[in-house]
Amino acid sequence: MHYSVLLQESINDLNINPQGIYIDATFGRGGHSKAILNRLTTGRLIAFDKDLDAISYARENFQFSNFEIVHASFASIYDYCLQHSLLGKIDGIIMDLGVSSPQLDNAARGFSFTHNGPLDMRMDVSKGITASQALEELSVDDLSYIFKVYGEERFAKKIALRIKDYIQQNGSIRTTLELAELIRATIGKKEKKNPATRCFQALRIYVNNELKDLEALLENILAVIKSGGRIAAISFHSLEDRIVKQKFSALINPKQELNRITKMLPQDSSQIKLKWITKKSKANEDELNQNVRSRSAILRVVEKL
C-alpha cells in the first residue's frame, strides 16, 4: 500500500485555486496529484517523474483531459515552463522528495537493504549508471566523500576501503544484500537503525543526482510560480530539508549589508520574495500509526509575494 505523506496538510496549504495551473514535481503513485485534481474545475495539473513505472501508472490510471505526465526530473520544470509559455503562470508546486514506497518495496529496483535484488538504485532505469557500477568506478576518496556528505556516515572511510578491497577481490558487488552485509560486517550493529541505512541513502542520492536536481529546481522556482502562488516541499532527510529551508529562508529574510554609519540593516522590501505559510510541519500521531515512513517527513510551505 502506498501512502502519500502529509497529504491533507500539504494540499490544504497549497490553497488550491479551482481554475489554476499546478505542478506535481514528484508524481510517484499520484496521491498528491489525485488530491489536487479533485479540487480543480477548469484548472489543470502537470506532473513530473523520472521513474518509468510511475509514468506507466499515470498513463493507465490518470486519463484526465486536464492532466499531463512528463517523463523528466523536476530539475527540468523551468525549461518545460519556458517552452510552453508557462513562466510566472503556475499557481502551486508540490514536491514529495526522496524515494517512494513502491520503489523501496520492489526488491528488483535495488533500493532496499532488507530485500535482495540487483544493486541498481536508478529512479530512471533508461539512463545513467547503476549503484553497482558506481562502486566499481569511484575511488576510495570519492566513495568516502559520498558516504560522509550524502549519508552523514561516521565510518565513511572505513566502509569505502572495505568495499574497494572486496571489489578488487571479487570483481563487483551485484546485489543489495551483498552490500548491506559488507557494511554490517565492517562497522557492526551499533544502533537501532540498520547499519546500511546511511550508505544506501548516500549511494542513491549520488546515482540519481538528487540534491543537485533539487538545487536546480529551487534556483529557478520564482520564475515559474506566479505572485500569490505557493510551493509545498516534503523532505525525508536532513540534507534535503536543509537545502529547502535555506533557499526559502534566503528569499524570506535576505542577508543585507549593515550600514556602516547607522549600524542598521536597510529596509529593502524588494529583496523579500516569499513568506512562510507553514515553516515546519510533521506527521500527526494518526498518520505515524498508519505509515511508519512518515516519521521523518517535514513539510515546508511558502507563498510568492
Curated annotation (Swiss-Prot):
Quote the SUPFAM superfamilies the UniProt record gives.
Putative methyltransferase TM0872, insert domain, S-adenosyl-L-methionine-dependent methyltransferases
Q: Which GO terms describe its molecular function?
A: rRNA (cytosine-N4-)-methyltransferase activity
State the superkingdom. Answer: Bacteria
* InterPro entries, per the entry: RsmH, SAM-dep_MeTrfase_MraW_recog, SAM-dependent_MTases_sf
Pfam families xrefs: Methyltransf_5
Q: What cellular component terms from Gene Ontology apply here?
A: cytoplasm
Kindly report, in one word, the top-level EC class recorded for this enzyme: transferase
Report the locations given in the UniProt record. Answer: Cytoplasm
Q: Name one GO biological process term.
A: rRNA base methylation
Gene3D superfamilies associated with the record: Putative methyltransferase TM0872, insert domain (1.10.150.170), Vaccinia Virus protein VP39 (3.40.50.150)
Give the main location.
cytoplasm
Q: What is its EC number?
A: 2.1.1.199
Q: Which reaction does it catalyse?
A: cytidine(1402) in 16S rRNA + S-adenosyl-L-methionine = N(4)-methylcytidine(1402) in 16S rRNA + S-adenosyl-L-homocysteine + H(+)
Q: Does the keyword Cytoplasm apply?
A: yes
Q: Where does S-adenosyl-L-methionine bind?
A: G30, G31, H32, D49, F74, D96, Q103
**What keywords are annotated for this sequence in UniProt?**
Cytoplasm, Methyltransferase, rRNA processing, S-adenosyl-L-methionine, Transferase
Q: Which family does it belong to?
A: Belongs to the methyltransferase superfamily. RsmH family.
Q: Which NCBIfam families match?
A: 16S rRNA (cytosine(1402)-N(4))-methyltransferase RsmH
What does the protein in this record do?
Specifically methylates the N4 position of cytidine in position 1402 (C1402) of 16S rRNA.
Know the name of this protein? Ribosomal RNA small subunit methyltransferase H
* Upper lineage: Bacteria, Pseudomonadati, Pseudomonadota, Gammaproteobacteria, Thiotrichales
Q: Which gene encodes it?
A: rsmH
